Swiss-Prot record:
Has four distinct domains: an N-terminal nucleotidyltransferase (NT) domain responsible for UTase activity, a central HD domain that encodes UR activity, and two C-terminal ACT domains that seem to have a role in glutamine sensing. This is Bifunctional uridylyltransferase/uridylyl-removing enzyme. The lineage of its organism: Bacteria, Pseudomonadati, Pseudomonadota, Gammaproteobacteria, Legionellales. It catalyses: [protein-PII]-L-tyrosine + UTP = [protein-PII]-uridylyl-L-tyrosine + diphosphate; [protein-PII]-uridylyl-L-tyrosine + H2O = [protein-PII]-L-tyrosine + UMP + H(+). Its cofactor is Mg(2+). Keywords: Hydrolase, Magnesium, Multifunctional enzyme, Nucleotidyltransferase, Repeat, Transferase.
Length: 861
């Protein structure tokens, strides 16, 4: 017996290997899945007969789910139902259990239920998943009358009438979307359960089976549920997803459903995609994947809506006329006749204008969605060059209402891609990294959504400055159009900001926009990264930085538009990207630039700014009873840079702590004056190792450093400030944890022994799949006798501690650091000098670069 099972197991293995070979040679996937199902039939029937379950009328073996539909994937579960009569003996039940054991022994992943017809029907009446799988059952062996009885007992006359089943499946899909629609699943989508995945196809078949009593979706054409073209589209989507799923199972050697990063690379190679100069093979493959699930989801939405409107609520219509072409039916817009778009193609865009103009419209009727899809061919060259068309499109952004829902629908129905060729190019475009969580088209629409949110009261508390600015914005449509085009040239190679500006220029000309409006839109696209790069990479407390930033703004009003676009862009890139620290940096840059642009700081140089801050801090300290002379003596040792970086309140607090201290080092951990991060302030006798010690301790406490300012005072004391965030990129709220870090820093900085060891931590699973080549560039700052070191590399635990050890070894002095992490990519800026206090020479730069690359490569653990 065991020998027989071993032979069968080997036969299954050989058959699957042959299938994989056929699949690799591009055999039709429908044929592959059906062949596998039929082959498994023979194995199961053989085992069923072997266990003598086929005699008489006591048992019936049924295939369920995808197996019942003859759609078996390489490592899919084999869902079985064994029905038996009420009077079956214990010995016969034991044979049924032995049959299941044999299935497992031969290597079949079997999920099973052994039960009576009445018990199964009772369970189906309470469980949506059970009734759904039963509807796909297929007789394999045994007494067929048992299956017929189950069909009768689970009929819509007895349970789950089609409207009840429809709403239950709709809720099930919404729950699935909520679970699998998160960012992580967008980066590594679930091909089976994710939005637009195979489940979206199966629900269409299930509800049509339940209502129309059909066996195949193609039969729904005769009922008007689906058109021939829509059926062909769904078949295309299904075959694409089946091929990807079969290949995924084959490569994983198990029932893997998630397109994780490592499998994305392997699948792209398997399907023959090749890297190009401007786009990776994996990005091409995932673009095709996202376009398929977008189309699949769009069809799913339209057909479910059609079922709801036509079958469930077909007798409950309230009609309100909008104009000669459109009307509302139960608050859903629809055409008044099916010739509207053919007679006037511009009405396609006009429909979406109505959606923006009338926010009370809940959506578009399914029949009209179908008509839009069938009319896309009308949006040709003549359509796009029409002045009437241009006016309607621009007016979508000029109503003063939120255009997001209308634009989202235009994207889903294919209208945006047909109207703007450049938008079609980025539809489905994904970047292979951890930073960009969405496709370019979806990110673009999220940026527009975020801009609209700035106007809404419920977001005013989260974005108070944005809310204030946008209410005074003269022409919001300029901001929306800047957002629409800001990433339009992604994936082409070259600078997407420059290429996008060219597209924006052509768009504004074609849409007859005023010269000043056109200039601002083009500028926004060209410089949409300016504000975030300045805030995160440069010293925004340096008046020269503000001056250089403002010189790139042609007019003061450009700042308002740029700030709003920057915040919306960051928030729309990745849900985890926006935090209080970025918020505070951008606000400080905005306010500093606003002041400079309005000439309020025209005559204030560094010395004047320092003098003002000193005076404010002095007033605070004197009011607390500290003498003027004591304060002056201490401040006389500080460098002017310190007073530029800190607020008067923080300067006063630091000064009091130093004057009241009885031992060194002085370590203070407190909220940063912007409240966006946590500040670590250290004052102690000069020690070359202090930066290395501090970064090592902070790394061991799992905090991230955002900025560092390192100052050696004239009295040979070190005055350093760090801005840190916790693991969630937020300021510290846990006081005990702050005290623990403070104590650890004090202990190690006071210790004259060895440097603290950096605890080794594994890279996250996601980070292991990316390899950012380490790049190091130097720029000499002759004014300050410093060298700017710009480092790009893979993110990893303890990276800054590794860099600090290299600086220490080579006697490199750090003056300032700006730390920026974008997904797996780190972009850090260090302001350094050699041990004599001057910029690095060529030889020193070469040695430093080689040492950094070596140590960083060794630290990837």
């Amino acid at each position: 017996m065991k020998n027989d099972n071993r032979i069968i197991k080997n036969t299954i293995k050989q058959f699957k290997e042959k299938l994989c070979k056929d699949f690799s040679q591009k055999t039709n996937i429908t044929s592959i899945t059906r062949k596998l199902a039929v082959f498994i039939d023979t194995i199961l029937i053989q085992l069923f007969i072997k266990n003598k379950l086929h005699f008489g009328d006591n048992f019936c073996l049924l295939a369920l789910g995808s197996y019942g539909r003859r759609e078996l994937q390489l490592h899919s579960d084999i869902d079985l139902l064994i029905l038996h009569t009420e009077k079956v003996s214990n010995i016969q039940l034991q044979r049924a259990q032995k049959f299941i054991q044999d299935c497992w022994d031969v290597g079949l992943e079997v999920s099973h239920q052994i039960t009576t017809v009445s018990s199964c029907a009772n369970l189906a009446s309470q469980d949506l998943s059970v009734i759904s799988t039963i509807m796909d059952m297929f007789l394999l062996c045994g007494h067929g009358a048992l299956m017929e009885e189950l069909i009768y007992q689970t009929h819509t006359l007895h349970m789950w009438p089609s409207h009840q089943y429809f709403f239950a499946k709709l809720q099930e899909q919404q729950n699935r979307y909520a679970k699998y629609g998160e960012t992580a699943y967008n980066l590594e989508p679930n091909i089976k359960n994710g939005p637009g995945g195979l489940r979206d196809l199966q629900i269409l078949l299930s509800i049509s089976k339940r209502h129309f009593k059909i066996k195949k979706l193609a039969e729904g054409i005769g009922y008007g549920f689906i058109t021939d073209k829509e059926y062909e589209e769904l078949k295309y989507c299904q075959n694409f997803l089946w091929r990807v799923r079969f290949a995924l199972h084959m490569l994983a050697g198990k029932p893997e459903e998630r397109l994780s990063f490592d499998y994305q690379v392997k699948l792209a190679q398997f399907f023959g995609y090749q890297d190009q100069s401007h786009i990776l093979a994996i990005e091409q493959f995932m673009k095709d994947y996202f376009k398929v699930i977008k189309r699949n989801r769009e069809l799913n939405e339209m057909l479910l809506q059609w079922f709801n409107e036509t079958i469930v609520y077909h007798q409950k219509q309230k009609i309100i006329r909008l104009d000669d072409e459109f009307q509302l039916s139960n608050r859903f817009i629809e055409v008044r006749n099916n010739r509207v778009f053919k007679q006037n193609p511009q009405s396609i865009l006009k429909l979406f204008y109505w959606l923006v103009k009338r926010p009370d419209i809940e959506g578009v009727r399914a029949s009209t969605i179908r008509l839009i899809r069938e009319s896309l061919f009308l949006m040709g060259k003549r359509f796009r060059q029409s002045k009437e068309t241009a006016n309607i499109f621009i007016n979508i952004f000029r109503t003063g209402n939120d255009p997001y829902d209308a634009l989202q629908r235009m994207n889903r129905y294919g209208v945006l891609a047909h109207y703007l060729d450049c938008f079609a190019t980025v539809t489905g475009q994904m970047q292979y990294d951890l930073f960009h969580a969405y496709t370019v088209d979806q990110h673009t629409l999220f940026v527009i959504r975020n801009i609209s949110r700035f106007k809404k009261n419920e977001y005013a508390k989260q974005f108070p400055l944005c809310a204030k600015i946008i209410t005074a914005l003269e022409k919001p449509e300029i901001l929306y159009l800047g957002a629409l085009f800001h990433d339009i040239a992604k994936g082409r190679g070259g600078d997407h900001s420059e290429l996008g500006a060219i597209e924006a220029q052509q768009f504004t000309q074609r849409h007859y926009m005023e010269a000043e409006d056109s200039k601002l839109i083009v500028w926004l696209v060209r410089y949409h990264l300016l504000m975030s790069q300045t805030a995160q990479r440069k010293d925004i407390y340096d008046p020269k930085t503000i001056e250089q930033f403002c010189q790139l703004l042609p007019h003061a009003r450009y700042l308002d538009y740029l700030y709003l676009l920057t915040v919306a862009d960051i928030c729309g890139t990745n849900p985890t990207l926006w935090n209080a620290w970025k918020d505070s940096l951008l606000k400080e840059l905005y306010h500093a630039a606003k002041t400079r642009l309005h000439k309020q700081q025209e005559l204030l140089d560094e010395a004047a700014l320092i003098s003002i801050r000193k005076q404010y801090a002095m007033d605070i300290l004197i009011s607390d009873g500290i003498s003027f002379r004591v304060i002056q003596d201490l401040w006389g040792q500080f460098k002017g840079k310190y007073f530029l970086h800190e607020s008067p309140e923080v300067i006063a607090r630091h000064t009091k702590a130093i004057l009241n201290s009885k031992q060194f080092p002085v370590v203070i951990i407190m909220p940063h004056h912007s409240q966006g991060g946590t500040e670590v302030f250290i004052y102690m006798p000069h020690k070359d190792e202090r930066f290395t010690i501090t970064t090592s301790v902070l790394s061991n406490h799992h905090v991230t450093i955002q900025e560092a300012a390192i100052i050696t005072c004239d009295n040979q004391f070190d005055l350093d400030t760090y801005i840190i965030l916790d693991e969630n990129n937020q300021a510290f709220l846990n006081e005990q944890r702050a005290r623990d870090i403070q104590k650890s820093l004090c202990d190690h900085l006071a210790n004259t022994g060895r440097l603290p060891a950096v605890s080794r931590r594994r890279l996250s699973r996601a980070l292991t799949h990316f390899n950012v080549k380490t790049q190091i560039n130097f720029i000499d700052d002759n004014t300050n006798h410093q060298t700017q070191l710009f480092l790009v590399t893979n993110d990893r635990p303890g990276l800054l501690a590794t860099i600090s050890r290299v600086f220490l070894t080579l006697n490199i002095h750090l003056h300032n650091a700006k730390i920026a992490t974008a997904g797996e990519r780190v972009e850090d800026m260090f302001y350094i000098s050699n041990q004599t206090g001057y910029s690095l020479n060529h030889e020193e730069k070469t040695i430093l670069k080689e040492k950094l690359i070596l140590e960083i490569s060794k630290s990837k653990y």
